[in-house]
Amino acid sequence: MAIPSFVDRATLTAVAGKGGHGCASVKREKFKPLGGPDGGNGGHGGSVILRVDPQVTTLVDYHWQSTRKATNGESGRGDNQAGANGSDMILAVPEGTVVSDADTGELLGDLVGVGAELVVAAGGRGGLGNAALANSARKAPGFALLGEAGEERKILLELKVVADIGLVGFPSAGKSSLIAAISRAKPKIADYPFTTLVPNLGVVVAGETTYTVADVPGLIPGASVGKGLGFDFLRHIERCRAIVHVIDCATYEPGRDPVSDLDVIEGELIAHGGLEDRPRLVVLNKVDVPDAADLADIIFDDVAERGWPVSRVSTKSGEGLNSLKFAMAELVEKARDNEPEPEPERIVIRPEPKNERQAFSIKRQGDGEGGFLWRVTGDKPTRWVAQTDFNNPEAVGYLSDRLNRLGVEEELLAMGAIAGDAVAVGGEDAVIFDFAPQIESGAELLSRRGEDQRLKSERPSATRRREMDREYHRAREEYGQVGRDLRGESWRARVAEEEWFEGRD
């Protein structure tokens, strides 16, 4: 199977790194019995970033390796040591790459300009350690927040060639020969249609003007509706400042002539849309052929009446090539002068709304089993649930405090929720709770440092945990001894049975 050297469309799965977990640790130092919390924050996960690289001209790398992952952030450690951030995955793409969401079709970005960047998957934020969670009411939290998952997104990359001039025309009109004659480009040239299947770029110097020319693959009638890969070919013209029609004056196909070819291609450009205002130039090619030269003379005035410059050239003999280069340079200079200057990007600061209830919404839904539940959605509640370690009762109490401060409990009561109702926080993978309203805030209760009396914690002490470990290992040893005894009895029974059979023989 041949490996394509030019790929202008690829689907990429970008997976950002996870954030590291925060650390729950208490400083232990001689003569400092109350050293306080010293758990560090987790590191942020790495992001997946697209960056325009002038050395890259194709998307072939993502055609073969379609999944790219950034590294995860490290978890925090004691002694206030924060975890290291994950490394960003920088992916080089050619200039003119259009990025869209493969599932929704949403346009994410249009990368034009060397060094332009776009974050396609943001890394997860690291969880806070208990040192960052401490306050006057919770002096030594016995928990930390978990790191958030990184974004995972499937994106579609489409390359639209960035060039000053696009050469358009029927297959075998001589576009590849023309770009090879006026630049150092070396396209594939052969005597059959659709020799060129991917755009070829060439740099042309005419006096003090330097510009790029794109040899767009041949167009046919119906290209604007997708016939003959028309969609793939036409999109490469969208960024060109000017369009040059290359007309074959030596065609011998029945039903074709230079003027009708020009009308057909121009009609396809108009039907594609967005190209009406681009300046045009018409090249009457292959005038080295006697009959073609006569035909070019006949139609020259008819084509010129359209208001476009017309050039007679021959890529074989070199006739008219030098004047054509300067004519295209003049076209490019005018197009550049008419381009509006890019306005500086305005930075708009939008403060968050003061009414925090806008940060979530609550709906009553069926649970699929004949009952119902209350579903709480919103960025903050969903993120807070993902950060919570549900194996730690104190962390669950902290989550309850945050939801109450946000107004979730008050809103549930206003909508008619009662104690014991099922409450789901998040989307389809939500965590479901039993609603327990009117719980006092942990700050209003007298307790030892870091404790939350709303929850009857069954967490054993350090001494009890050591005793449980010893009991566990003792039980495993007894279990192992029973197994060994059973295997010994089985072996002795088998030996006795064999001896009995031997005695009978």
Swiss-Prot record:
NCBIfam families: Obg_CgtA, Obg_CgtA_exten, PRK12296.1, PRK12297.1, PRK12299.1
Keywords: Cytoplasm, GTP-binding, Hydrolase, Magnesium, Metal-binding, Nucleotide-binding
GO biological process, one term: ribosome biogenesis
Domain Obg: 4-162
Organism annotation: Cutibacterium acnes (strain DSM 16379 / KPA171202)
Annotated residues for binding of Mg(2+): S176, T196
Full protein name: GTPase Obg
Entry-linked SUPFAM superfamilies: Obg GTP-binding protein C-terminal domain (SSF102741), Obg GTP-binding protein N-terminal domain (SSF82051), P-loop containing nucleoside triphosphate hydrolases (SSF52540)
InterPro entries (alphabetical): G_OBG (IPR031167), GTP-bd (IPR006073), GTP-bd_Obg/CgtA (IPR014100), GTP-bd_prot_GTP1/OBG_C_sf (IPR036346), GTP1-OBG_CS (IPR006074), GTP1_OBG_dom (IPR006169), GTP1_OBG_dom_sf (IPR036726), OBG_GTPase (IPR045086)
Bias kind Gly residues: ranges: 36-46
Assembly information from the UniProt record: Monomer.
Compartment(s) of residence: Cytoplasm
Ligand binding (GTP): 169-176, 194-198, 215-218, 285-288, 314-316
EC number: 3.6.5.-
Record gene name: obg
Family per similarity comment: Belongs to the TRAFAC class OBG-HflX-like GTPase superfamily. OBG GTPase family.
Annotated region (Disordered), positions in chain: 29-48, 447-472
Cofactor: Mg(2+)
GO cellular component: cytoplasm
UniProt cross-references to CDD domains, sorted A to Z: Obg
PROSITE patterns per the UniProt record, alphabetical: G_OBG, GTP1_OBG, OBG, OCT
Function: An essential GTPase which binds GTP, GDP and possibly (p)ppGpp with moderate affinity, with high nucleotide exchange rates and a fairly low GTP hydrolysis rate. Plays a role in control of the cell cycle, stress response, ribosome biogenesis and in those bacteria that undergo differentiation, in morphogenesis control.
Pfam families: DUF1967 (PF09269), GTP1_OBG (PF01018), MMR_HSR1 (PF01926)
